[in-house]
Amino acid sequence: MSRFFSRGYHYDTASSSEDEELLTSSEEELMSSSEEEVVSDDSFFNDSESESAESDDDSDGKPYGPDWFKKPQFRKGGAPGGSGASRFLKGNADSSDESDDEGKKVVKSARDKLLDELNNTYNKIDAAEMTQDWTTILSEFESATKLLVKAQQQNMGTPNVFVRVVAQVEDLVAETSQAEIKNKIVAKAYNTVKQRVRKIARENEELLAKFRQHPEAFEKDSTVEFGQARDFDASDLTLMGRKVADRSAIVSSPSDFFSALRIVIDSRGKKGTDIQAQIKTMEELVSISKSPYESIIAYLNLIPIRFDACANLAYQPLEQWKASHNNVTSLLELLEANIESYHVTELAPRNEFIEEEPQPNENGVRMILGSVFTFVERLDDEFNKSLLNTDPHSSDYLDRLRDEQSVYNLILRSQLYLEKVLPEDTASKHLCRSFVRRLDHIYYKTSKLVDIVERAAWASVPANSSSKYITYSDDPDYNFKLVNTLCTVVSSEQEMLKRRATLYQIYYYALNNQFSKAKEMLVQSNVRNSINSQDPTIQILFNRVVVQLGLAAFKLCLVEDCHQILNEVSTASHLRDIMGQQSLQRVSNNISSNGTVTPTEMLCLPFHQHINLDLIDAVFMTCSLLIEIPHMAAFYSGIKVKRIPYSQKSIRRALEHYEKSSFQGPPETLRDHVIHAAKAMQRGNWAQCINYLRSISTWTLLGDKMEKVLEQLAERIQIESLKTYIFTYKRFYTKLSVQKLSELFSLPTEQVISVIQTLENTINIKGSLNEAKEMLIFDKGDEITKLEEVAIKLTKETKYQSERLNNVSQRQ
């Protein structure tokens, strides 16, 4: 309607530049009431029940303004006896008299609603007092405390009615004796109310004292400012995003410090809370704390809030992480300096009143409930998350990796602290988490790197620090003793962590060239029997152990053992996944499709812990070459040998694909180099075979063991090439000179004789050495020559093609 008249009528007025929409009288009342609330905001905490009267002067005078053409009942302000458009609304259609009887609609502010709820709570407690219904009293008193927190979050201070509720419940508790209560449930509710009201009364001691002196002053539904109760001055200290007190006022008494701390604690995790403001408040409280107890409590609350700030992020930002690291370090320094007076431990009883220090035990030590090592664990987790979310090929990854030493230092430092504060009979059980974290950081490192990490970590702890389990020393075997000690303690105390500790120990031994011991430990552990039912993280660790064990066998040139160990793992279709070396995005997709509950970060390993997949392929294919090429030569020469199962990555399958290819160029990839080495071995050209394998750049990942491994590998290639030569060409010879074979393969005569004798005993080569062991004499058998072999093959192919053509002609 307004849109229609705005087009049909034009007016010019200085009081308005825009067209006004048609308002009902009820809407005008709401607007006028809201305007009055804004005007009277100076007395925000004073209850005001007076409402402004509606002025009808404009309706009595001459119409003017943009709505002069409207009927009186629709004009702004309305007619004296009408309600404007509201009379056409539902419920207002009977008569104007009925509308007047209904009265005006009251719109209450959030403050008024909260005060009404507190008044209702007061009345319900008053009614429950008559029947001694302590269950209802407890429920309503808890509701009142929640409403107080809500009021303080809205900058309303402490309502007077809340003070009356506390005084009411306090008097009721004092008048009631627990002996009078027979019902167990009611008695339990009574005890809970007694504890809660004592705590609340202590926090509002000054207000209660004023209430006792002048109860009539608290009859009005007003609120007491947070600063007025403690004579605070306005300053820049921010609490929950609002100014509450200056620094000098807060430190004026311990109750002020804990009152501010209590507000932060009560509002933590609630919707609409400004976490950054909480962090700033806690930082201020840490800086102004006067006693060690205040500092400890402040740190125990500041550090979790820092972690809460990044709960929805992929990982904690570097600046926040370093701030958390500094806070944990400062907390440990504080606890170490006051270890004779305060102990922070998970075994301490819960203290309901943080304002009061816990009572000292028989040793004069006050036990504070908390977990320092939980903070260290969270720091370590955030560190790993940041590595997983950083490009591993960038300099940022290397810069971030430098912080690993500081994390390990904190792990060791927290372990030493826990050893001092935990009871001796249960210390080992609670220290298992710390030991596993230490193993997480050292099990994949060589002995030299572990020595560097340990030396730096022990240098960072206070002087004269020692562990009752193992302390750093210059003993060359210290690193192995360290891993053995940590794994032994964990395995004996925690059954859930036993498998993980055992696998850590096996991995460390395999990595540091202790293949025999590592293999023996893996067989005795029986982990393989139940690995399919284990946690995905244990399965990933087991696969890594198996691969590392195979690499350890290869370094010792134990080709058969290496091939047997790596055969199942290396031929898996998703090797990267089962090794925990896939990207976070891929893991997230797999988890969403499979419904796995394991956290994404636990299924991935940082890049510096990865085992190079090209190295695994190179080792497996090289072992396959040394085993399968002589076996294939023996099989094709008519010797009955045991069939070897082969996989997609075996050299036999690779050669089949290679021979089918139309173009065979020079080697480029790792696979090409191994295939060309295999072809050279088939021809008996061992030198060329070694050159092809040496040209693989992946061998540099073997470190300082590379040259030694390649030398052993070259010797093994010479021996296997000798076997292949004998199997392939024995059909063309009646006898072979041992001396000639020695010169051809650059092997000592004794070694050539040993190889031939081994073939005689294990494989029926239909030949033997003469008495002087100078000649290998072959018995004439039913072997076919190469020409006969080609003729037979051609005959079979011709027959097959002929049958195929006959079938085609018959169909036509």
UniProtKB/Swiss-Prot annotation:
The keyword Cytoplasm applies. The keyword DNA-binding does not apply. Residues 17-40, 48-59 have a biased composition (Acidic residues). Residues 1-105 are annotated as: Disordered. One of its GO terms (molecular function) is translation initiation factor activity. One of its GO terms (biological process) is formation of cytoplasmic translation initiation complex. Residues 607-783 form the PCI domain. Keywords: Cytoplasm, Initiation factor, Protein biosynthesis. InterPro entries: EIF3C (IPR027516), EIF3C_N_dom (IPR008905), PCI_dom (IPR000717). Pfam families: eIF-3c_N (PF05470), PCI (PF01399). It is found in: Cytoplasm. GO terms for cellular component: cytoplasmic stress granule; eukaryotic 43S preinitiation complex; eukaryotic 48S preinitiation complex; eukaryotic translation initiation factor 3 complex; eukaryotic translation initiation factor 3 complex, eIF3e; eukaryotic translation initiation factor 3 complex, eIF3m; multi-eIF complex. Its main location: cytoplasm. Component of the eukaryotic translation initiation factor 3 (eIF-3) complex, which is involved in protein synthesis of a specialized repertoire of mRNAs and, together with other initiation factors, stimulates binding of mRNA and methionyl-tRNAi to the 40S ribosome. The eIF-3 complex specifically targets and initiates translation of a subset of mRNAs involved in cell proliferation. PANTHER family: EUKARYOTIC TRANSLATION INITATION FACTOR 3, SUBUNIT 8 EIF3S8 -RELATED, EUKARYOTIC TRANSLATION INITIATION FACTOR 3 SUBUNIT C-RELATED. Component of the eukaryotic translation initiation factor 3 (eIF-3) complex. Belongs to the eIF-3 subunit C family. HAMAP family: eIF3c. This is Eukaryotic translation initiation factor 3 subunit C. It comes from Eremothecium gossypii (strain ATCC 10895 / CBS 109.51 / FGSC 9923 / NRRL Y-1056) (Yeast). The lineage of its organism: Eukaryota, Fungi, Dikarya, Ascomycota, Saccharomycotina.
